[in-house]
Amino acid sequence: VDKDCHAITPYINYLDSRTKEDVEELASHHYEIWAKETGNPQPNCMFPAMFARWMMNNCEGFKEKGRKFMHNAPYILANLAGLSAEDAFIDWGTMSGWGLGYRVTEKKWSKEQLEILGIPMEMMPKIQKPWDIIGTLSETFAKETGLKPGIPICAGAGDTMQSMIGCGVIKPDQAADVAGTCAMFCIATDGINEELSKPENELIFNSGTLENTYFYWGFIRTGGLALRWYRDNVCNLSLIHISEPTR
């Protein structure tokens, strides 16, 4: 975003693979700090940290006016509150969605990792607790939404982090299998597990919404999306005959 917290780059979702070559090059260095500080042993083309590198190298608008990197949900909340780039934020669950660049247990950006990534610390948003109040609904967006101005706005949390709470996965050794766009099998732990954070396991590690909650997840990137594709492109629902149940 620019100094006024307005978007100046396209939104890139995690299905995008434009960073594949950069990921392969960065992974070839085998930096141990990734697993040690984030729980993620290697870069991945769906990590926002890699998108940030791509934007810095390829988006002229960002090179000229870029001030902060922001996720989509914090971006919307910040604009509802009328914040500037100086007040840009990210909750600690969504922070861990960056994949690289932070200390997951300390909930802080990692100076060492960001230097490896080539991302300036000053471009990173401040890290908030999900329940922190980041501002109030502005007069402008109160008129747009029909809500009362001054309503407190909290930092919020990541979608998968919240879905774990919805599934009741809040203690170590609890697990859930969810298939939205991506099919994900998630299991809660009490922190980074060295065995699980080995590259060959191809697992991703995140911080949960609540304090001292963490989980690993394995995934099929389009596992849920494939169901819709099958329905829309393979099935001809008009030819499907549903018989009456037998008694």
Where are these regions (language model features)?
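Glycine-rich phosphate-binding loop of actin/hexokinase-like ATP-binding domains
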Residues: V1-K3, A7-L26, G66, M70-S110, ...
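Proline-centered helix-kink/hinge sites
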Residues: P10, P125, P152, E244-P245
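Gly/Ser/Thr-rich active-site cleft segment
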Residues: A35-G158
